[in-house]
Curated annotation (Swiss-Prot):
GO terms for molecular function: enzyme regulator activity. It is a lipid-anchor. Regulator of peptidoglycan synthesis that is essential for the function of penicillin-binding protein 1B (PBP1b). It comes from Yersinia enterocolitica serotype O:8 / biotype 1B (strain NCTC 13174 / 8081). GO terms for biological process: peptidoglycan biosynthetic process; regulation of cell shape. It is found in: Cell outer membrane. Belongs to the LpoB family. This is Penicillin-binding protein activator LpoB.
Amino acid sequence: MKRYLSVALAALVLTGCITQPPVEPTTPPVTIEPVTPPVPETPPPVDNVPPPPKMEQSIDWAASVEPLVAQMVNSNDVANGSILLLDSVKNNTNGRLPTAKATSALHQVLSSNKKFVLISPQQLAVAKQTLGLSEEDSLGSRSKAIGLARYVSAQYVLYSDVSGDVKSPTIEMQLMQAQTGEIIWSGNGPVKR
């Protein structure tokens, strides 16, 4: 029985020694006082720099081609009422130019005089389609222009190109006979702005 008693006593002693976790002292939370942000200093006013002027001025294509057309019309080698194929103006400058506007201005100036009968843009489009050329094809070479002129039964072809520096280009025109390819008139002049 002593054994039972010693075991019971040991059990009581051991149950009384339950370990508790140590209590850590709690510190009060640190209070952070709000800080007002510093007011940013406004930078001194900046002088606005004006944008540079645009270098690209509009081109007066009609004024550029009228003197050349006047010279061509006064040529003795061309009969009144001749059929003319107007090829689109080519850009051979070192930049971009609105050559479609140049072609349109040239068409208007030529339409206003009675020396030539112009092949209509519709006839030209049909002929290009028949020959397998796209409508945007500017014919690019004199030989293509002459071949197309023969196809539409034109007597003459006006081949024009703009060359030189894009800031001060020169327009050149050549009037050629469609049957022989002979240049019967040639002229050039500055492009006017």
